[in-house]
Amino acid sequence: MSMFLDTAKISVQAGRGGDGMVAFRREKYVPNGGPWGGDGGKGGSVIFRVDEGLRTLMDFRYNRKFKAKSGEKGMTKGMHGRGAEDLIVFVPQGTTVRDAETGKVITDLVEHGQEVVIAKGGRGGRGNIRFATPRNPAPEIAENGEPGEERQLELELKILADVGLVGFPSVGKSTLLSVVSSAKPKIGAYHFTTIVPNLGMVRTKSGDSFAMADLPGLIEGASQGIGLGTQFLRHIERTRVILHVIDMSASEGRDPYEDYVSINNELETYNLRLMERPQIIVANKMDMPEAQENLKAFKKKLAAQYDEFDDLPMIFPISSLAHQGLENLLEATAELLAKTDEFLLYDEADLVDEEAYYGFAETEKDFEITRDDDATWVLSGEKLERLFVMTNMERDESIMKFARQLRGMGVDEALRERGAKDGDLVRIGKFEFEFVD
């Protein structure tokens, strides 16, 4: 049996922007010939694209790191460096992408060809031609390329099925799927024969068709991870109609109605929206002794829970092995699907703001100041660190420009307020300098 991998942890890193160039042309009466250094090219972004031909996340088990290429450096004659191509990563339909650090849903990929920028490539650094001013017509300033974004991700694949079969182990879900579709699930006379979801296409006599999933058997406590647990409960989320299969012969010694209540409790505990989906009760193994009596008792207990007869779920007595009652069940399922819309998987508040690019949603702080045990002042913060890595520390003019940027951000004043004195060491990353009051 082919393995079905439905979760994966990967890292993605977008490409760095190319460095800008410091260059001068040779021209009479123009200081240093005039600036002629071009900009660096943009780094490649990492883009996820849905491929309907993929069925599992198996590929991500062997390839966990995805890194886009960096942009080329700027060139002389004011020519820009070539931008790097984006890295396209193909994922199957039904893939949910989460930020591994925050647990936030970044995107839900369900349409063939759908694309999402998962990590944005860094912009290219500006060449010295960009920094020319009347006061400084020959600047020796160029920016380094901006680093590309790097993210740790959790991928989760929920199979795309219109109808999901749920129920205790060994109630006949796999057998039902095998006789109404071309799927060939593993069938055995023991619990948890199905340890991976099986998917089959069903066509009714009237010509309707839909995808049906045989999901691994649930047991009490599945929503807390007991048994096969939440790793397979997640697949039910995408179904529009649930077929609740019950062993009406009680061959395992359990009460059919108690089975029904127990499974619904697990669905409700896992996700309240699962109980919003219409359910059809499939009373299976009706060819077995005592099944008819058990069904009568089941209907009586079920009716006691409803005030109105019309609110009762539909019940279809069948025997998968004997091929009895299947046509009526499938026709009713197709009719219910036709009038059932898709359900939202997540609250809007749970989703990262969805633009063409899915970036970090947190408000970016300009900088933070801490102090090490050796009394060194440490500057950090996304904006400040980005300015730092884009500064060419080998050129004095670039360093002076960076110092002006720090002053404009209020870093100097903040250091003074914290008690920094003339000559104190200040560190940004691995770069250290003396504070000048």
Curated annotation (Swiss-Prot):
The protein's name is GTPase Obg
User: Sorted alphabetically, which Gene3D superfamilies does this protein's record hold?
Assistant: GTP-binding protein OBG, C-terminal domain, GTP1/OBG domain, P-loop containing nucleotide triphosphate hydrolases
Its source organism is Streptococcus pyogenes serotype M4 (strain MGAS10750)
Pinpoint the OBG-type G domain residues: 161-338
| Alphabetical GO biological process terms | ribosome biogenesis
What positions does the domain Obg occupy?
Answer: 2-160
Oligomer status and interactors: Monomer.
This protein's gene is called obg
The cofactor(s) it depends on are:
Mg(2+)
